[in-house]
Amino acid sequence: MNEFWNRRTCVILTGASKGIGQCLAVEIGKLLVSESTIILTARDTNGLEKTKKMINKENSDILIECYSVDLYNSDATMFEKIVEPIDSTKYELFLLIHNAGSIGNLNHLAADMNEPDEWNKYMMLNLYSVTCLTSVFLSKFNSDTAEKCIVNMTSLLGIEPYKSVGYYCVGKASREMFFRVLALENPTLNILSYSPGPVMTDMYTNMSLNSKDKDLREQLTSEQQQQYIVKVEDACQKLVNILAMKSYKTGSRIDYHDK
């Protein structure tokens, strides 16, 4: 087994009830050694329970905790209640994966994005909850002996502009910059922004059907685009392997299609 995963590990994974988050939970669950813990969060309780059963089927020697949370209404107190029961002395690796996110209002072009309430709601889920949970995570697990690894699930749209997905582009770009700053300020942390490529998820389908921009809708549904679609299992397996190899600079971004 790889050195990275062959340790008692505590994993916190957001957006774990479906799609990439669910698959990632299962793939990581397969690798965790005995006495490890994986904490799953999402709004959908049924989805979380399904994920838990899928992990248990692969590995019954780890503890799995599920928390139904609304990241649109999150704060430090909520996250502190989740991490408070964890005995931080038990683990050699603490892994936080920020997977939860939303696409935003696809009916708004950039010139239409003028509603502070809509901006605040979007950024609460996609940025503020991320920075808040990260702060709580680092405060709780502050041992010098255990490694702390943070993965920010990102997207090509964090570095490339696309029409009608302004909220999503801004959210992903701001998250990436936050983690670059965090890595610069804390060089001992293991921080990675990982872009899984275009994976056929509910979010991708929503964008391809409901984007206000006709060109984007046609691009996402074109035959040419289909050759670039990544299977969710492949995207998750690559992340697991990247973490195991650890050949990246902390704070950097890696895309699924990178060589």
Walk through the language-model features, giving the residues of each.
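C-terminal helical subdomain
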Residues: S193-P196, S211-K259
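Amphipathic alpha-helical dimer-interface segment in Rossmann-like NAD(P)H-dependent oxidoreductases
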Residues: M124-A146, L184
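Rossmann-fold cofactor-recognition segment
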Residues: E58-D75
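Catalytic Tyr-X3-Lys loop
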Residues: S102, D112-T131, R175
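Conserved NAD(P)H cofactor-binding loop of Rossmann-fold oxidoreductase domains
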Residues: N99-N107
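Conserved glycine-rich cofactor-binding loop
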Residues: S17-K18
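Conserved glycine-rich Rossmann-like NAD(P)H-binding loop of the short-chain dehydrogenase/reductase
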Residues: V33-K50
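Catalytic loop of short-chain dehydrogenase/reductase
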Residues: N142, E147-S174, F179-L184, S195-V199, ...
